[in-house]
């Protein structure tokens, strides 16, 4: 357990350090990539324990391989809350905005700013007198959601699906 915790902490510290000196575009793409990885782990903890099935579902080009699909699946399977779903969808839209923009893209652009201001999780935690920038709201949301997804993955492991027993005819009459 200590190894898992220290590994997660090192992973987290590495991400925070990387965010400090990156452009807005890099932060948006790195943050969503990080969340996508954790959503994949969450789903993998929940589905049956079969590496082939996991790869078939969660592989990059497969049904649950995209950030959008993983967000929807995690919510549809009841693995994340409505608020987490809301913020993940907004983060997905923010990321798409940065990917589509051939220029660098910035968090202070009006449409990105609006999406960041709609994130719900920071408003539950940040003090009212604080006025964080859209970039900070985004980074803060990614940080909180990453921790939540790690915690949810450990919960999902206790609810791991198992294949059903052998086929059995049922008399419906």
Where would I find each of the regions flagged by the language model?
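Amphipathic alpha-helical interface elements
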Residues: 1-173
């Amino acid at each position: 357990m200590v190894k898992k915790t220290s590994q997660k902490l090192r992973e987290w510290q590495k991400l925070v350090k990387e965010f400090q000196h990156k452009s807005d575009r890099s932060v948006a793409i790195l943050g969503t990539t990080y969340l996508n990885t954790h959503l994949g782990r969450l789903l993998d903890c929940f589905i049956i324990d079969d590496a082939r099935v996991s790869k078939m579902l969660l592989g990059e080009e497969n049904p649950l391989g995209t950030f959008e699909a993983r967000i929807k699946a995690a919510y549809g399977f009841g693995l994340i809350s409505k608020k987490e779903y809301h913020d993940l969808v907004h983060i997905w839209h923010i990321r798409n905005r940065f990917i589509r923009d051939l220029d660098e893209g910035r968090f202070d652009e009006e449409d990105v700013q609006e999406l960041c201001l709609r994130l719900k999780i920071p408003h539950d935690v940040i003090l009212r007198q604080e006025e964080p920038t859209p970039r900070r709201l985004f980074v803060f949301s990614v940080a909180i959601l990453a921790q939540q997804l790690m915690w949810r993955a450990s919960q999902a492991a206790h609810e791991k699906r198992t294949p059903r027993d052998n086929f059995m005819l049922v008399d419906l009459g």
